[in-house]
Amino acid sequence: NGAVRCQKAGVDGVLLHAAHGYLINEFLSPYTNRRTDDYGGNIENRARFALEIIHGIRDACGPDYPIGIRISACEYLDYNGLDPAEGITLELSKQYAKLFEGAGVDLLDVSAGIYETMNTAWEPTGFDQGWKTALARELKTVVNIPVVCTSVIRSPDYAEQLLQEHACDFIGSARAHLADPAWANKALNGQDA
């Protein structure tokens, strides 16, 4: 009902948060999803919960209401000494991206990390600008829907470079705006942000 309420309130679209160890991500990840029923095991079963939500929104809100999904394209389990193959890898994310696009998702928002690797989801300031952009670049090669690039995008010039290189179609820069509420205005005026 959340998407229906958003639509009735005039919200332009919805973005499902299927990243960072939250509920939908827990179903998608072989690391957290140890179920043996129709919602666990193979990729189709692990994606079932997300796909049911997508189909439910599409049925309730109609074919023209934009649906996006934010995913952790890589869980980086190796950052904590775990086997990365036990979780979501870039290759697995490519399969999920195709499934989501096939289900009618209009936008793919690419992030990374889960609770166990939270520094890859909410990076400390020491992380290089745009260090996750390679994930978005790769996922963009397997889908025909717009891809959002996030990850410590501090500079408007760097954001523009990513767009010019076709690394992504949109830039997610929420943290830049939290750090500097004038970020977008500075970008428009050619100032350093």
Model-identified regions with their sequence ranges:
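Flavin-dependent oxidoreductase catalytic cores
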Residues: 1-193
